[in-house]
Amino acid sequence: MNRLFRLISSLISLVLLLIVAQPAKAQNNPYADDKRLHFGFSLGMDFLSYGVEEADSLLQLDRHGKHGKPGTIYHARTSNVGMGFSVGFIADLRLTRHLNVRFCPGMHFGERTITYKSYDKLDNEIKGVACSNNKPSVLSLPIDIPLYLKWSSEREVNCRPFVTLGGGVSFDLGRSKERVILQKMMDYFFEVGIGCDLYFPWFKLAPELRYRLGFNNVLTPTADCEKEEWPLPADDYFYTDALSRLTNQQISLVFNFE
């Protein structure tokens, strides 16, 4: 985590240095925004988590004996922030002087984790889940197909702030039946971002901070998992049955090269 923090700090420092190093009066690439259509690519760092909702009733050992130790109640406490990165393609269509529409398909690589706690009614204490893993991870390899509107302010020498608003659909190729939580493949999402175009003689660099919120409940219930011949032992079902809803959440620091 410390190495990641240092990496992010270094990248932010580099961007700030590039902004400061821009000539005070000379305007680089003055006709960059006059193109009707242009292309580029993006590289990003992702901070991944879930919106977690527990099951309506506290989960105990049910009549099928599928939920762990008898007399124990399981809680899905929190979603830990996971790390990832992304690569993407940019197609930008200029509509007006200040408004563009952008098609930015991309692929993300990362993991999300959930922390579980158990309450033993016999011992009357809260403790970590008595299992092999009380922080199971869910691999995430989504391919995004988003569409954005980008509104830009007036250009000031070699800087031009902007905001983006849009959404799209995501198909998760990391969905694996070998995980104790089976995530649904498709999700719809809303995304908002803020950034700044930095103009250089031959290209634009646009650092952008984005927030994404998934709409769908991506949790696959155990009943559906069984239909898909879920290979996990029944003792691990409590990971899913302690939950009622999971939604994808993500904050990204993206560097757009155009």
Predicted regions and their residues:
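Conserved binding-pocket/active-site segment within a compact domain
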Residues: 171-176, 184-188, 196-197
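Flexible, solvent-exposed loop segments that connect beta-strands
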Residues: 53-78, 111-138, 174-183, 219-243
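Residues that define the transmembrane beta-barrel architecture of outer-membrane proteins
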Residues: 35-37, 81-85, 139-143, 159, ...
